């Protein structure tokens, strides 16, 4: 990306914030009247054209104004959005919930999710994950020359069977070698760490397995079908139609499928584990869902139970607010319950 000036950065900031607040494409006239009265119209138009050329802004087809692109939102989120809540009544409601010692921590978190979802009109997902489930063994049973059953056993007594199909019977030997490596190196590894561990073993596997990409992908998919006691609760589905971007039938269907999905949350959790971030924004294009944003944070209830809170929003969202709300809950939890 070409270097952009401080003025152009501020211009992008104003356009994002105005579009988030109004849902109206932003033209040079609005920018000058509301944000940059001392800058000439020609300069603003040139800067907007430059930001568009960089892919940070897009032209709206129904007006002369611009709207942020996904890249523009990402730039804004990274450079300008700081966690912040200016709704004191909302903070008071949440504090009162956390102060109520007659409720269990699970109920406190549920009530907090409901309050936030009702306030923002956005879905809020609570995901509980028992991270103590360990991999105990992987076995393979040959069915015929083109298929085999992979059996995965975990510490909670769960036994998962899946069939792998392949064209070349030589792959059977590759699968057997790969499983032997896994059993040597991954036994008693927490399920949530499997992906990272396997990633670090790729060079070893590549040396011993001819069709390592196919075999590795197939086995990883089988391992990831193990659900380590994941319990998902969704709040705010009924408010989806209040979000203009979700009123399109196909987009609404996509959002509902996301809320029912499990794999999407595993991808997001994997990304958060890699970054080590307390509160993370994941843009939908990173997980094959355009024009959607996932904001998440983790609450460590105890050593066995990790709870993830996720908000699902359109890219046109107040990033400071959703980050602020999640950090507020995390801070209240850590002050009084951890």
From Swiss-Prot:
- Show the GO MF annotations: DNA binding
Q: Which Gene3D superfamilies does the UniProt record give?
A: 3.30.450.40, Heat-inducible transcription repressor hrca homolog, domain 3, Winged helix-like DNA-binding domain superfamily/Winged helix DNA-binding domain
Q: Which domain of life is it from?
A: Bacteria
Gene Ontology terms: biological process: negative regulation of DNA-templated transcription
Which HAMAP family does this entry report, sorted A to Z?
HrcA
* Organism of provenance: Malacoplasma penetrans (strain HF-2) (Mycoplasma penetrans)
Instruction: Tell me yes or no: is GTP-binding among this UniProt entry's keywords.
Output: no
NCBIfam families in UniProt: hrcA
Function, in words: Negative regulator of class I heat shock genes (grpE-dnaK-dnaJ and groELS operons). Prevents heat-shock induction of these operons.
Q: Which UniProt keywords are given for this protein, alphabetically ordered?
A: Repressor, Stress response, Transcription, Transcription regulation
Which family does the record assign? Belongs to the HrcA family.
What SUPFAM superfamilies is this protein classified in? GAF domain-like (SSF55781), Winged helix' DNA-binding domain (SSF46785)
Q: Write the protein's name.
A: Heat-inducible transcription repressor HrcA
UniProt entry tagged with the keyword Plastid: no
